[in-house]
């Protein structure tokens, strides 16, 4: 018969499954073991974990829990302890952490090696008697699916790993002192694991909670998009393999802080690339990228004195119009104006690892600056290759080339004509006027603050079939062990 623990586990897994079925993420931040170790190591430093180790009350613990658990009643313990003036940890180090998948699914095992040198003073010898102590604290990172709040990650089951304790005398002295040191070490064997559990484990749990809170704050940092901004929120966390995965929703806000669009449900499941020893990966859906591009490239209008700005293009336009209507071409003076209006917002597409931006353009040609009506109006479906690149922690989009995929004659004062006759020159004009302006807006890039916050100087981008992926570009530089 299934026990209550099995029932609780099944309920937790079912709750997590229902949450995931209801909320489809539009972005995912995947953190590999290297990032987890680095962030937790830093939190242990910030929580003064080594100071806690140095303050372990070794002597008191030996009195309270002697070898075998027998109370101190004038036994051998008292005989040993009366020869000790003081006993304390002299130096303490927390060595390189390890993060591995647990035997239980959706859990991570964190191993924290502890390295200490302790010493005691005795009237039997003038020098301090020192011995080396090593042990390993272990804890489990798991998902808390309790009904009291949203699913979150917690660290639990912290204790010293079985059989990891090693105590060794550093320097041999006289026979009597060596025998005393051996008795002290024997008394520490049952005491030290309890000290680590009671004194250090709460610090480890607090450090993990601090790390998790920092990660949640990190993903919520607003991303500036011209006058708008993009914000992410945690939908639910997950543990897969040796990674922590934060599934995110997103929202677009205007300059007043009003939400203009929610992205809590992706149209399709995101393609999740494997980390392959990459410290972190941020996957952002096509829908969110599309909205970000649209926020930067809002509809706008350009009025250009073509003969002054692009004289060669003005000459070619006049020649092309002359093939349609010579009288209309003759009307084009030195103040001829081309008006370009972008309609709505651009459409962003990802197709087999390649990105494209499509936009609707209205183009009008006026014979002079005094003319009130255009010679003709064209509707153009244009597209450009979109290429992402990074500069430090800035993500930048650049539009390469532009093509007029479809041209329609919307209005004409020179009679009906086939607009494809003007396709080459119209594409040239759009490329020369519109593309530099839009790339100028995109050139400032989008700051991705989590890159430096996770310990990297730069990022690199790539595309899957339906998402933009950011990964670190610089080599990983692990922090030094926690020591004092």
UniProtKB/Swiss-Prot annotation:
Keyword Disulfide bond part of the UniProt annotation: yes
Keyword Cell inner membrane found: no
UniProt main location, coarse: secreted
UniProt xrefs under InterPro entries: Bactericidal_perm-incr_a/b_dom, Bpifb1, Lipid-bd_serum_glycop_C, Lipid-bd_serum_glycop_N
MF-aspect GO terms: lipid binding
Residues of this chain annotated as glycosylated in UniProt: 48, 264, 401
GO BP term, pick one: negative regulation of toll-like receptor 4 signaling pathway
Keyword terms, alphabetized: Disulfide bond, Glycoprotein, Immunity, Innate immunity, Secreted, Signal
Tissue specificity of this protein: Detected in duodenum mucosal crypts of cholera patients, near Paneth cells (at protein level). Detected in trachea, nasal septal epithelium and lung.
This protein's GO CC annotations: extracellular exosome; extracellular region
Disulfide pattern: 158-201
Signal peptide: 1-21
Subcellular location: Secreted
UniProt record similarity statement: Belongs to the BPI/LBP/Plunc superfamily. Plunc family.
UniProt function note: May play a role in innate immunity in mouth, nose and lungs. Binds bacterial lipopolysaccharide (LPS) and modulates the cellular responses to LPS.
Protein name: BPI fold-containing family B member 1
Organism: Homo sapiens (Human)
Record lineage: Eukaryota, Metazoa, Chordata, Craniata, Vertebrata
